[in-house]
């Protein structure tokens, strides 16, 4: 019923041009589904007095672990609600960002980046929500404003990403493991194609034009290509779907339940304090507690449990229990640039009216999903370019056949937190005149800039401090400018010119003191238009045996604590040369 209402109302309101009303209705429907799931989850789940294992988080890694773990006496905890069927429609991705299905984290103000964003903050990805309070025992705990695309639902961030399946190369991981045997086991995941649910997605003329232009510049078909997506019959297929399809639902699963603290007994992780349905409950595990709460969530949970840098914990009023200096450190993220940088002379038939047209909807639900743009995950082509470093690739290019002006400024500009003045000066004229913009993002795969995550207070419900230190390395800025220069070469090739692709000639606000197209101008542009690609890693770094340099050993056991593991993207010592979702699966394996 919700799906029928969704498409019928969307079709009506977008056809008559009421973008804001259409997005508002979509938001209301997702909220109704959210609260329906929440009310359903309020029915008490019978819980065992003790479990073999408790998995904290049902995202990419957590759901994979749950589907593979041999024990049946397992509890899976999820802070958000269960997902709904509309989440399986890939094109609805932007509508989920900034909703109750998203943690909505926000970074600290960035001195060297995000100059075009409000308060120089990067939203990961979406806007503020009103403070609310929940009753937990005798306490009133505020939920502070936060934003960042980090999935808060069964399926985790895999529900909110572009579904690109990256087949990693061994060269990316050679320094991660102390023993060659451990690296061999890790690489088996990719070499044996343990994740088989991948398909080529919907594409427009733009993706083909960029790929063909790259061929003319001498790049190979293994460098620019249409990516594989984690879909099944055109629908989003996550590790949570896989978990359920394998019949592992014998495990207990508790949603809308936030872990407050890990309780240690003589150095052994035995208990969790969890807020669920307005109550504080205690859960016990006899063999292990596995943190799979993500790069922000896992580090934050360790810190608020007293596991982390002693002095920093004491500063915010948390009693240190295990001194692990590297918890929350080593934060790395893929960043890109280039929204509304390219204009296109031809329509790609991705106007909202085209998307919700009955024939397009019918194709998706009748099995002709590859002909329906509803199966489109956002990215229709990728490219990988080496700048001469030791890595396989230094830059990635993501080809997106739309821009921030595609919805008339109703929703997308809020996702990236654009300043109102910047929108009115640079973006709104494109929207007002009907010019079409597309996006080809140069993305820095191995940034030198490194940040950290910390606690704001001893209150576990307060949003964490997230400071990625974007573009504090001048080398990062230079490499992104090189990416823009490569993009200029691509747009000058015949396949791109036939589509009418050209660079936006309007100087970007705040950069007009520099000559347009000079390196100094593009350096200013990169520092202004700085986009997270939503791939943070590294805050619970794994590796060697020294607790001073890493958080866990290569077998994912937290140093100084028995029966406590971290198994998600937070353990990655460095960023892979591509989208890390598949790497998180391999960590779970």
Which positions does each model-derived feature cover?
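N-terminal redox-cofactor-binding region of secreted/periplasmic oxidoreductases
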Residues: 2-589
């Amino acid at each position: 019923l919700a799906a029928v209402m969704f498409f019928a109302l969307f079709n009506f309101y977008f056809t008559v041009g009421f973008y804001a009303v259409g997005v508002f209705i979509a938001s209301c429907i997702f909220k109704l589904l959210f609260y329906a799931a929440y009310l359903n989850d309020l029915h008490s789940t019978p819980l065992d007095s003790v479990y073999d294992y408790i998995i904290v988080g049902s995202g990419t890694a957590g759901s994979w672990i749950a589907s593979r773990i041999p024990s049946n006496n397992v509890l899976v905890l999820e802070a958000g609600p269960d997902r709904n069927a509309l989440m399986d429609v890939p094109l609805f991705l932007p509508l989920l960002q900034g909703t109750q299905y998203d943690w909505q984290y926000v970074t600290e103000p960035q001195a060297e980046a995000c100059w075009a964003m409000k308060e120089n903050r990067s939203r990961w990805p979406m806007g503020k929500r009103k403070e609310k309070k929940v009753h937990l025992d005798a306490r009133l705990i505020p939920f502070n404003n936060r934003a960042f695309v980090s999935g808060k639902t069964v399926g985790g961030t895999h529900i909110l990403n572009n579904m690109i399946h990256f087949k990693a190369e061994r060269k990316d991981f050679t320094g991660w493991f102390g023993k060659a045997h451990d690296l061999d086991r890790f690489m088996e995941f990719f070499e044996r194609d343990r994740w088989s649910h991948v398909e080529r997605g919907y594409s427009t003329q733009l993706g083909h034009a960029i790929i063909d232009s790259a061929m003319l510049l001498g790049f190979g078909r293994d460098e620019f290509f249409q990516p594989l997506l984690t879909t099944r019959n055109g629908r989003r297929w996550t590790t949570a779907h896989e978990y359920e399809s394998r019949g592992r639902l014998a495990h207990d699963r508790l949603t809308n339940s936030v872990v407050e603290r890990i309780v240690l007994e003589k150095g052994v992780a035995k208990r969790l304090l969890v807020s669920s349905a307005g109550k504080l409950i205690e859960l016990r595990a006899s063999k292990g507690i596995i943190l799979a709460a993500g790069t922000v969530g896992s580090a934050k949970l360790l810190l608020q449990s007293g596991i982390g840098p002693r002095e920093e914990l004491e500063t915010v009023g948390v009693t240190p229990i295990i001194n692990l200096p590297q918890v929350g450190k080593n934060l790395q993220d893929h960043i890109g640039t280039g929204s509304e940088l390219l204009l296109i002379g031809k329509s790609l038939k991705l106007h909202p009216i085209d998307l919700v047209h009955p024939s397009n909807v019918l194709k998706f639900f009748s099995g002709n999903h590859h002909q329906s743009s509803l199966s489109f995950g956002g990215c229709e082509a990728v490219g990988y370019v080496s700048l001469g470093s030791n890595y396989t690739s230094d830059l990635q290019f993501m080809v997106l056949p739309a821009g921030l002006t595609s919805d008339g400024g109703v929703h997308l500009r809020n996702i990236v937190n654009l300043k109102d003045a910047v929108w009115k000066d640079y973006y709104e004229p494109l929207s007002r005149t009907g010019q079409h913009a597309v996006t080809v993002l140069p993305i820095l795969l191995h940034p030198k800039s490194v940040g950290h995550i910390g606690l704001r207070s001893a209150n576990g419900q307060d949003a964490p401090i997230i400071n990625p230190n974007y573009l504090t390395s001048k080398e990062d800025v230079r490499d992104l400018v090189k990416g823009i220069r490569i993009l200029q070469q691509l747009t000058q090739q015949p396949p791109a010119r036939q589509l009418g692709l050209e660079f936006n000639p309007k100087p970007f606000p705040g950069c007009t003191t520099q000559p347009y197209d000079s390196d100094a101008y593009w350096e200013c542009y990169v520092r202004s238009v700085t986009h997270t690609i939503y791939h943070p890693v590294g805050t619970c770094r794994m590796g060697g045996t020294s607790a001073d340099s890493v958080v866990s050993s290569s077998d994912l056991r937290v140093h100084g604590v028995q029966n406590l593991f971290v198994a998600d993207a937070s353990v990655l010592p460095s960023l892979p040369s591509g989208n890390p979702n598949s790497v998180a699966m391999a960590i779970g394996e």
